[in-house]
Amino acid sequence: MGASHFVLCGDDDDKVLGTLVDVTETFGGHFTAEHHGKPLGYLRHFAKQGGQIVHLTMYGEDFESTTPSIPTDAPIAVVVGGAKVPGEIYKLANYNIAVGHQPHSEVAALALFLSELMGGVAGSEQFPGARLEVKPHPSGKVVIDHEEDSDTSQ
C-alpha cells in the first residue's frame, strides 16, 4: 500500500532521510530513501528505464478522472514540488495531475493521489517488522510495543 521508495532531490537533508528510516524502523514495512542532487537527471534516467512520471501540480488535469488511466504495472515516480519546480518537469512527466486548482499542501496532494491510485486507504494494514502497532480505538490511544512484549517474555 502506498510508496516503497522516496527520493529527495535538490538540497541534501539528512534529517528528512533519517526521519524516514526511523518511521520505517518503528512502524515496519519495506521503505527506502535516498538523496539525488539532480532531479531532472534522475527523472530522465527513470523514464529511460520504463518508469512513468506523475507530476502533482495545481495546473494539471483533474486527478480523479486522470489517475485511473495511469498504468500500475511499471514503476511510478511521483514528483511533488513547490513553487520552484523547473518548467521541464511538465514536459518530462507522463501525467501532470492537479489535486485542486488552488494552492494546497503537497503532502495532502500526495496522500489523495496515492489513495486514488491504490484504490483507497487500508486502514488496518499492519506492516511487517513493526516495533509499534497502532490499534483502532474509539476514544483513546492503543499502541502495542512489540519490543516491550518480547522483553517481558524472556
Predicted ranges, named:
Residues 4-12:
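Short internal beta-strands
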Residues 5, 52, 94-95:
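Well-ordered beta-strand positions
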Residues 8-9, 55-57, 99-100:
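Conserved beta-strand segments of the P-loop GTPase G domain that flank and frequently precede/overlap
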Residues 11-14, 103-105:
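Gly/Ser/Thr-rich loops at beta-strand to alpha-helix junctions
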Residues 17-85:
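S-adenosyl-L-methionine/SAH cofactor-binding core of RNA-modifying enzymes
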Residues 90-128, 132-138:
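Structured adenosyl-cofactor binding patch, chiefly the S-adenosyl-L-methionine
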Residues 138-154:
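Long, charged alpha-helical interface segments
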